A protein has these predicted regions:
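N-terminal cap/lid segment of alpha/beta-hydrolase-fold proteins
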Residues: 36-82
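Glycine-rich "HGGG/HGxG" loop immediately N-terminal to the catalytic nucleophile
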Residues: 99, 122-134
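Alpha/beta-hydrolase active-site loop
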Residues: 133-154
Length: 165
């Protein structure tokens, strides 16, 4: 019975992963066509935590390979000199940058990292339709796009970029 259960679980997981991949690709193509509209970013402080006086904050956007525009908060240490190590931060599925991932990013910036906390595709201020879809494939691509974006930032040491999420 134990072997049958493990086989059933493995088959179900494989089916879900395959179906998720196909759905992600299809949804990504649909989103790419719909992403021509601009994001409606808020520029006032909208987090559940106070802004640190040790960092500068600004909103940035970047696009993943599916054409979905991602919204992010960038935190830069005020005492920054030279090229900085960088970290891209995002929370679990359904979380937004105004919550814990933003707090982690800001705290890491206080410690000398240039950071971004971004909303994954289909979530928060980022683009993508339908809304509130969770796709492991696209989430992975979002992190790749975040690393690519950070590597183009003038203040970032492209050899020292990490992710957290």
């Amino acid at each position: 019975m134990d072997i049958l259960w493990k086989t059933l679980c493995a088959a179900s997981a494989a089916w879900l992963l395959t179906t998720g991949s196909l759905l992600a690709t299809t949804d990504g193509l649909k989103s790419e066509m719909k992403m021509e509209k601009s994001l409606n970013l808020t520029h006032e402080w909208d987090k559940v935590f106070p802004l640190s006086n040790k960092v500068n904050h600004r909103k940035v956007t970047f696009t993943n390979r599916y054409g979905i525009t991602l919204a992010a908060d960038m935190y830069v240490p005020k005492q920054a000199e030279g090229k900085l190590p960088a970290i891209a931060v995002s929370g679990p599925f359904g979380a937004v940058k105004e919550q814990s991932s933003g707090l982690y990013a800001m705290t890491l910036a206080e410690r000398g990292f240039l950071t971004i906390a971004f909303d994954p595709s289909y979530t928060g201020e980022s683009g993508g339709e339908p809304r509130y879809v969770a796709s492991p494939d696209i989430n992975t691509e979002d992190f790749c796009a975040a690393v690519d974006f950070l590597s183009t930032c003038e203040q970032v040491d492209a050899d020292r970029i990490g992710i957290l999420g």
